[in-house]
């Protein structure tokens, strides 16, 4: 490999890693005294964890011959992975699932839908794409 090609590959890789890749949206939550939360799209690792989490629930439902997948705690799980504070730190941890589930369900659903749309997942992503076309 020539030096020029090697430098070109390195600069391309550096360029890829230097680009802000995760879309985000700051949301004011009036139901939570107007706090602002930044919802960020899932990164690759978070997306892998999400896919595994949902696949496990799907497999469990199929194994039990259930037609409905147990979605208990899914909105809380999404927020644990995608809600950030003003310092850019994840706002919640796995320890917060139970407490999050006690919060207003409409708020959890609204924030989770934003996260799903930003992450390009499911119905939320399809609706967002339709709105932008």
Which residues are covered by each model-predicted region?
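Short, surface-exposed, charged amphipathic helix/loop patches that serve as local interaction elements
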Residues: 2-6, 32-133
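Short acidic-hydrophobic surface loop/beta-edge motif
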Residues: 23-33
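Extended acidic low-complexity intrinsically disordered regions
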Residues: 1-23
């Amino acid at each position: 490999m020539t030096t020029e090609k090697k430098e070109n590959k390195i600069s391309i890789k550096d360029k890829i890693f230097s680009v802000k890749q995760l879309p985000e949206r700051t949301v004011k939550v009036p139901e939570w005294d107007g706090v602002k939360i930044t919802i960020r799209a899932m990164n690759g690792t978070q997306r892998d964890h999400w896919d595994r989490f949902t696949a496990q629930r799907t497999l469990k439902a199929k194994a039990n011959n259930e037609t409905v997948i147990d979605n208990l705690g899914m909105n809380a799980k999404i927020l644990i992975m995608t809600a950030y504070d003003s310092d850019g730190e994840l706002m919640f941890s796995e320890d917060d699932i139970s407490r999050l589930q006690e919060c207003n369900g409409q708020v959890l659903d609204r924030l989770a839908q934003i996260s799903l749309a930003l992450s390009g997942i499911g119905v939320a992503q399809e609706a967002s794409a339709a709105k932008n076309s």
